[in-house]
Each structure stands twice: as C-alpha cells, then as structure tokens.
Amino acid sequence: MAEQTEKAFLKQPKVFLSSKKSGKGKKPGKGGNRFWKSIGLGFKTPREAIEGTYIDKKCPFTGTVSIRGRIIAGTCHSAKMNRTIIVRRNYLHFVKKYQRYEKRHSNIPAHISPCFRVKEGDHVIIGQCRPLSKTVRFNVVKVIPAGSAAAGKKAFTAA
C-alpha cells in the first residue's frame, strides 16, 4: 500500500481495494492490484511506475493524465518544488539589425512523477498535457542523467 501521508486516504481510482477474495501472493506493487498504462509515443513505462507503491493522480503512467500536443527536451534547472521541476530551454534569437544571434532561454514548469529521480543538470523530455495547476502544463516522460550524456564523449586528460 502507498505511504499514507495526507489527510485523505490515498488510492488509485481504478483499483478496487475491498475485494472479498484473499489475494494470495498479490501484493500491491508486485503485479497485484496496481493500475499503470503505456503512454505511447515511443516512451517506455518506468519499472518504478509498475512495481512502485506511490499514488500520484497527475502521473502520466499511473494517473489520469494523457500526454498530447508538444514534446519538448530541456535541462532540469531547479528541482526544489514538491513534484515539480523547472525545465530550462536555451535557444538563439536572430537580431535582424545586427545580423547576429543572441542567446535566450525559457523556463517551463513541469510535473515530475515520483517514479523518476532527477537532479539539477539532468536532461529531461517533457510532454504537454492538460493544465495541472495555474502554471504547470507539462509532464516529465523521460529523464536522461547528466553523466550518461557525456559518457560517449572522451574527456580531455593531460598525460
């Protein structure tokens, strides 16, 4: 069962908990009574979403949110909020008068499911969904750790 930390009883809306049958070997999170889905679009459902015990109604894998619209990649700029991160997207803007480019960036708040572990500097892929709050309209669908992106490139070493 999920950790009950809120005042309201946390449960998944599509799972019936008061079954009269004795569920031998059916533990929540171990293939038992847990709802999860594939969001499609080429993204795999994380193992933590299938086997975990968290309850998150805004999670695209275990909740009632569908991913539709834009798919955007960026870098995690801040992970200080509860289940929400700030994704920074850097881009170049052309200034016609000077025939040059200037650096710009945009910050996008995105909901992150408890099935992901993210730190500042990690690359994330976010998908658009319905408005989850006043400012959040995106959901994290994939996390690429910061070390793995540079693993293919050989670092300079002075021999």
Curated annotation (Swiss-Prot):
A GO biological-process term = translation
One GO MF term on file is: rRNA binding
Keyword Cell wall biogenesis/degradation on entry: no
**SUPFAM superfamilies attached to this UniProt entry:** Nucleic acid-binding proteins
Q: Which PROSITE patterns match?
A: RIBOSOMAL_S17
Where does the protein end up? Cytoplasm
What keywords is this UniProt entry annotated with? Cytoplasm, Ribonucleoprotein, Ribosomal protein, RNA-binding, rRNA-binding
Query: Superkingdom, according to UniProt?
Result: Eukaryota
This chain belongs to the protein called Small ribosomal subunit protein uS17
**Gene behind this chain?**
RPS11
